[in-house]
Amino acid sequence: MEHKDPSQMYGTTILCIRRGNQVIIAGDGQVSLGQTVIKNSAKKIKRLANDTVITGFAGATADAFTLFERLESKLEKHPGQLLRACVELAKDWRMDKYLRRLEAMMIVADKSISLIISGNGDVLEPENGIAAIGSGGNYALAAAKALCETNERFSQNMTLEYTITTAMRIASEICIYTNNNIIIEKIED
């Protein structure tokens, strides 16, 4: 099997928005195998570390679960230190011959930080508290940025749930690998 470019993940959309003391991650439910939809209600969002961390994945499902397990192990070694746990995971991802072949990306968030862990082992903190990955990620990101800016400029008082659901719905209308069966997890302080 030829290793694909991890920056070109197909088949899902994961979006994270942070505002004040709240962070929310949403993922669509579609699982595709080639051009065929296999499942419409998959859960690509998961809580870790006694529900203090939420994460979503794009890419190969088995690879993502391997990364969830590794991240959970790092969080046990570094409780309450999400950035450090993610950097340690990224180091392993780059150095380990087996892990380097994994084709997945993750968004990880706790009450204080949101991070993207790329398929290349990069750990990135998004600007403006908004991050997206997957085939519909750019559409969801653009929609979320527009909604957040509109909310801020015109004092619309849009909830995070409304903002993220609307952005995901827009992405699902554009990306054929994303559906509108949206699953949301939230952390608020």
Swiss-Prot record:
Residues that span the membrane, as ranges: none
InterPro entries for the chain: ATP-dep_Prtase_HsIV_su, Ntn_hydrolases_N, Proteasome_sua/b, Proteasome_suB-type
Protein localization: Cytoplasm
GO biological process, one term: proteolysis involved in protein catabolic process
CDD domains registered for this protein in UniProt: protease_HslV
Protein purpose: Protease subunit of a proteasome-like degradation complex believed to be a general protein degrading machinery.
NCBIfam families named among the record's database cross-references: ATP_dep_HslV, PRK05456.1
Quaternary structure (record): A double ring-shaped homohexamer of HslV is capped on each side by a ring-shaped HslU homohexamer. The assembly of the HslU/HslV complex is dependent on binding of ATP.
Protein name listed in UniProt: ATP-dependent protease subunit HslV
Organism encoding this protein: Ehrlichia canis (strain Jake)
